[in-house]
Amino acid sequence: MKNSAGSLWCRAGSPGSVLIAAIWILVMLTIFGAGLYRIASARILMSQAVESRIVSYYLAKSAVNDAEAVLFVNDKPAYDTLFSLSEEHDKSVGGGRFVYTVEDEERRIDVNQSPAEIIAGLPGLNSELAQALVNSSLRPFAAKEELLLVEGISGEIFEGLKDFVSVYSGGKVNINTAPAEVLTALGIEKSLAAAIVEFRKGADGKEGTSDDEVFESPSEVLSRMRSKVSFMTAQEQTLAAITDLLTAGSRYYRVKIKTYVFNKEAMNYEALIGKGSVLEWRER
């Protein structure tokens, strides 16, 4: 009588059993190899990510050094304009590359040094909120985001406000770069603020171009604009009264940096710099 099991299983040592064992070994090796590949791939990707992060950090530091060399040279004009600050700086360093742009901080209202009357004129604010900011125990604020901790300053108000305020500008506003919203906060009526911005645009009607009009000092605003603008007595008095709140140049600059590692975009950074110092450093 034949053994029925013999029809289903090959005897040990037979060619069939060797083939089955070989297949099982091959399957196990394939699974093991796939696992090793996943582990190795994950480690390689992690290593590349760490390397990219480290390299991008040092690229950003190089960008800040480059910006300091450009912005704080001895023969630089005593004034800053939207055009002079508009250049995009693009440099390769080793296997990486950085690209940065610059904004002066003096185009904004300093909420640490400005009185409530000026702060109240900023978008979204009023006298009550301005007093809350001025009287806050957090003042002087270390970062503009701390304004969100002041009672009454909602996220919506902050979003509409953040581009017009600073905690480092030194208290004076750059007449060459400040937007109309900042100029009106100083007490300049809207039509006059718009006229100043329009005058700065030059012949082509665009700000940030080579034909922009430049105020080399705040005291020449009236004399420079009289050829194109008819001032009322009250407007002249307003400009004369706020001259001490204005500047034509800047001491602090915000550097916005993009880095590229292995020809791929890596980390982005933002640094606020003064001469010889980095006041803020953050990833974007």
Question: Where in the sequence are the language-model features?
Answer:
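N-terminal leader/signal peptides at the extreme start of proteins
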Residues: 1-15
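Compositionally biased linear targeting/interaction segments
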Residues: 2-3, 17-284
